[in-house]
């Protein structure tokens, strides 16, 4: 009977866990729909910003301005990279499968790749899980910020990028990249690595689909060429981080929805297995009792 009680308790415990994981799946599904819509709208803005860059650079080229002096731009093919800053984005919470682990693995892989080329690497972290991992393993993270990946905010992203841009413009770093998990569809996330500084022509032109960017830039930019490019570059860099945060959040909800769905299904399977074990143990107990009763009857004859 003690065995039956134990199995019954396990079944009850698993059923409670199943209810929790199912509820978390529903919450993540709801949040994912909202995050997906925000990511879609933000992508449209990002593509528009790329189109503005292309338009301005095209106008400058038509005017015979080939040599861009803006401090944000470099000829990537000729640039000698000695110092790289990696901005990584992870979640503030767990229970999302390999979402955080995959990002951390990519950061470590990129770090090792750069170090093999004698390139100095500095990390800047957004997200509690990533920051905790590197702190626990004794890996220095220059700037740490939590509660931003879970609630993307443009002003906070802008503030975070100020120090990054200052270090780049002062020569403390030669290149800045962002590594994060991106949203591909409801069931798929992919690791994305994007160079945001320096800005090169290959980075600017993202080959948007014709139906994604329908408007063209018709207004003439005012100010000097460098002023125009500096102003656009600041927006480009800031929004690159903000969009990465939005993209990462959508991917996080997608990963958590999948993880909770898997956990719910596993709980269902475990309940079935435990129920079979319970019924088997119950049948054995009944059989044992019947045998004992029959033995007692035979003894009284």
Curated annotation (Swiss-Prot):
Pfam family, one: ATP-synt
Protein's membrane topology: Peripheral membrane protein
Keywords: ATP synthesis, Cell inner membrane, Cell membrane, CF(1), Hydrogen ion transport, Ion transport, Membrane, Transport
Broad class of where this protein is predominantly found: membrane
InterPro entries documented for this protein: ATP_synth_F1_ATPase_gsu, ATP_synth_F1_gsu
A molecular function (GO) term: proton-transporting ATP synthase activity, rotational mechanism
GO terms classed as biological process: proton motive force-driven plasma membrane ATP synthesis
UniProt keyword DNA damage, yes or no: no
Localization annotation: Cell inner membrane
GO cellular component: plasma membrane; proton-transporting ATP synthase complex
UniProt subunit comment: F-type ATPases have 2 components, CF(1) - the catalytic core - and CF(0) - the membrane proton channel. CF(1) has five subunits: alpha(3), beta(3), gamma(1), delta(1), epsilon(1). CF(0) has three main subunits: a, b and c.
Summary of the function given for this chain in its UniProt record: Produces ATP from ADP in the presence of a proton gradient across the membrane. The gamma chain is believed to be important in regulating ATPase activity and the flow of protons through the CF(0) complex.
Family the entry assigns: Belongs to the ATPase gamma chain family.
Name under which the protein is recorded: ATP synthase gamma chain
């Amino acid at each position: 009977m003690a065995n039956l009680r134990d199995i019954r308790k396990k079944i009850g415990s698993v059923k409670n866990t199943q209810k929790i994981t199912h509820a978390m799946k529903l919450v993540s599904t709801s949040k994912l729909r909202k995050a997906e819509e925000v990511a879609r709208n933000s992508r449209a803005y990002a593509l528009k910003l790329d189109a503005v860059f292309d338009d301005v650079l095209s106008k400058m080229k038509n005017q015979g301005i080939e040599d861009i002096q803006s401090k944000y731009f470099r000829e990537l093919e000729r640039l000698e990279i000695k110092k790289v800053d990696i901005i990584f984005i992870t979640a503030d919470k767990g229970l999302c499968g390999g979402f955080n682990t995959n990002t951390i693995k990519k950061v470590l892989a990129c770090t090792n790749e750069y170090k093999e080329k004698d390139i100095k690497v500095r990390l800047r972290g957004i997200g509690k899980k990533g920051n905790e991992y590197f702190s626990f393993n004794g890996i220095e993270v220059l700037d740490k910020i939590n509660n931003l990946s879970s609630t993307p905010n443009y002003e906070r992203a802008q503030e975070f990028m100020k120090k990054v841009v200052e270090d780049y413009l002062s020569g403390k770093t030669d290149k800045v990249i962002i590594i994060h998990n991106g949203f591909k569809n409801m069931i798929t996330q992919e690791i994305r690595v994007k160079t945001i500084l320096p800005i090169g022509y290959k980075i600017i032109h993202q080959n948007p689909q014709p139906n994604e960017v329908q408007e063209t830039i018709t207004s003439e930019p005012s100010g000097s060429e460098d002023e125009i490019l500096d102003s656009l570059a600041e927006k480009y860099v800031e929004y690159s981080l903000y969009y990465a945060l939005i993209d990462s959040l959508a991917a996080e909800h997608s990963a958590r929805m999948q993880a909770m769905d898997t956990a719910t299904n596993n709980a269902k399977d475990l309940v079935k297995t435990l129920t079979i074990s319970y019924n088997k143990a119950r049948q054995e107990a009944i059989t044992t009792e019947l045998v004992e009763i029959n033995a007692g009857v035979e003894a009284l004859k």
